[in-house]
């Protein structure tokens, strides 16, 4: 089910990441945390989902700024390549923002494929960016220019050097 921007989720009985904090409820609306407090009382009709998190810790999403989302490796040959990252791997690791980049393999993997994978993660509701460039000199880009890639492609926020 595709969630709207105003769907509310209530996490009950979780311990915030700060270990000194008592058990709290967390009210989320869309992508925003609205309230963190003990025993939040919201009319049931406004809540899309209630999750009992008793015994669980609520932590912020992690930002991983160096991920080979299209796969990695390859310097040892074709059998040495690592497969592309799956969204479920980000979920399992608690990563909510990712910056993808090419690794040593700028030949069988491309900036175009990297941008496409970044767009796919964004379409799935994650926050994803990527870096243009590769190990090679002159570096690989999508437009033929590092400056143009960064200027005109929204997902590209820098260059791998």
Give names to the regions the model predicted.
Residues 2-9, 16-59:
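Histidine-rich, glycine-flanked metal-binding segment
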Residues 51-52, 100, 128-131:
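General beta-strand structural signal in soluble alpha/beta enzymes
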Residues 120-161:
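Metal-coordinating catalytic core of metallo-dependent amide/deamination hydrolases
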Residues 45-56, 87, 143-152:
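Short amphipathic alpha-helices and their capping/turn segments at secondary-structure boundaries
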Residues 53-116:
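Metal-associated gating/positioning segment near the N- to mid-region
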Residues 5-7, 46-47, 54, 58, ...:
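Short coil/turn connectors at secondary-structure junctions
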